[in-house]
Amino acid sequence: MVESDKSSVEELKKRVRKRSRGKKNEQQKAEEKTHTVEENADETQKKSEKKVKKVRGKIEEEEEKVEAMEDGEDEKNIVIVGKGIMTNVTFDSLDLSEQTSIAIKEMGFQYMTQIQAGSIQPLLEGKDVLGAARTGSGKTLAFLIPAVELLFKERFSPRNGTGVIVICPTRELAIQTKNVAEELLKHHSQTVSMVIGGNNRRSEAQRIASGSNLVIATPGRLLDHLQNTKAFIYKHLKCLVIDEADRILEENFEEDMNKILKILPKTRQTALFSATQTSKVKDLARVSLTSPVHVDVDDGRRKVTNEGLEQGYCVVPSKQRLILLISFLKKNLNKKIMVFFSTCKSVQFHTEIMKISDVDVSDIHGGMDQNRRTKTFFDFMKAKKGILLCTDVAARGLDIPSVDWIIQYDPPDKPTEYIHRVGRTARGEGAKGKALLVLIPEELQFIRYLKAAKVPVKELEFNEKRLSNVQSALEKCVAKDYNLNKLAKDAYRAYLSAYNSHSLKDIFNVHRLDLLAVAESFCFSSPPKVNLNIESGAGKVRKARKQQGRNGFSPYSPYGKSTPTKEA
């Protein structure tokens, strides 16, 4: 009985040991399984961490690219920030030919301006460039130096035809650009010629046929030669430069430019320079440039006008405008002055009136013979003192040295035109100049537009007692002289017509003008009978006056009831 019990116990112990071994095996297997799962989890985690690192790396790379673009470090976007227009980068640092280097030194240049430092190297490398810089920043050398170097390296000769074309908005700017090009080409064998409206077309065609490697042109005349001068060899064109693109488009050359771009070879380098980046300029850049390097100059100036420029305006009744101008010019005969008018007829009339008033002046306007216009321009450029009466043909791009005063006798069409007009003075580092805008009381709200455009102007008062007492004498001269009387009528009509076409009609409304006072400013005792072809706007004026009344606006309260916007 006991033995059987013992055997039962032993058998029971064996079963227990068996079960425990089974449990241990199960536990061991479970542990191994758990360990395997953990290992797999670790591997998965490591893989995901690697992916995260890769993604983070890509994000960081993108952020670095964005930062580089914002900082102007990206190759396609060069933003130059600094004080003034000059840099400490020398022309010697460029890899230029000996001939060009000698010419630059002979011209008296050692250091580059900001637009030159940003544009010349990319252009030398054959890249397209879209340059944005204000007037007087040195854009001409920025594109002419690479143009001359390109012609030299490609070994262009007259038989190769034209390798570079430069398009300018005005004849005067084209003339000035050609002069600079001639100085740069002084020690080179390459040739330069100019094709502009007003010149003898046949002579231009002969020069082109003989082989002009560098052609400076205005849009209309260039298109004429491209379409009609069979001997014009432009199939080897390497580079097209569009200077003052915004002004070209403002002068309604958009259609001509599109035709020119269609005719010229597509495989070329293109450089486009513009003081302002309007929507039309961007459209032109889009169709003419390929992956351009953007060069944007920020010279650290808060003002949009030149640094050394003092700007003011005076409010004068219409009938006293002419007397004020004569008095001012007589007191400043030893200065170099440019006076801007809205029309050619007005320039012609005031030139005659100044002669009668013993004020020696010269004049430039679009209706002049080109030879006389060119001579007048260069005479005024070289003069240390003198008075030039002009239209806006002289408002852009021209580098006229040492201009003391810019007088805007007729107000500009918009703030940008004001900026370009006053840009003829205080040009270059450390230069000084003054500008005066003449307004009648009805035009005073124009100051709001200028201040919104960050143009700092202050009101200047004039002493009526010091004005020349010549009004009645001038009226008698105009009444007696048939030719002068006709010229005065034409100028009066042209002034009103230009006024009526003004873009800022909320300010420059011809129906608000006191025609008797306007007539007096053209030396008439009463308004002359002229056909103006101006639609009546009396109803609109009455409505506008009511609206102005609600807001407190008037010619004598240009800011209305609300506080005027502070100048930035």
From Swiss-Prot:
GO terms for molecular function: ATP binding; ATP hydrolysis activity; RNA binding; RNA helicase activity. Residues 321-468 form the Helicase C-terminal domain. Residues 1-70, 540-568 are annotated as: Disordered. SMART domains: DEXDc (SM00487), DUF4217 (SM01178), HELICc (SM00490). ATP binds at A133, R134, T135, G136, S137, G138, K139, T140. GO terms for cellular component: nucleolus. It catalyses: ATP + H2O = ADP + phosphate + H(+). Transmembrane segments: none annotated. The keyword ATP-binding applies. SUPFAM superfamilies: P-loop containing nucleoside triphosphate hydrolases. Keywords: ATP-binding, Coiled coil, Helicase, Hydrolase, Nucleotide-binding, RNA-binding. Residues 120-295 form the Helicase ATP-binding domain. Residues 13-78 form a coiled coil. The Q motif is unique to and characteristic of the DEAD box family of RNA helicases and controls ATP binding and hydrolysis. Belongs to the DEAD box helicase family. DDX18/HAS1 subfamily. This is DEAD-box ATP-dependent RNA helicase 51. It comes from Arabidopsis thaliana (Mouse-ear cress). The gene is RH51.
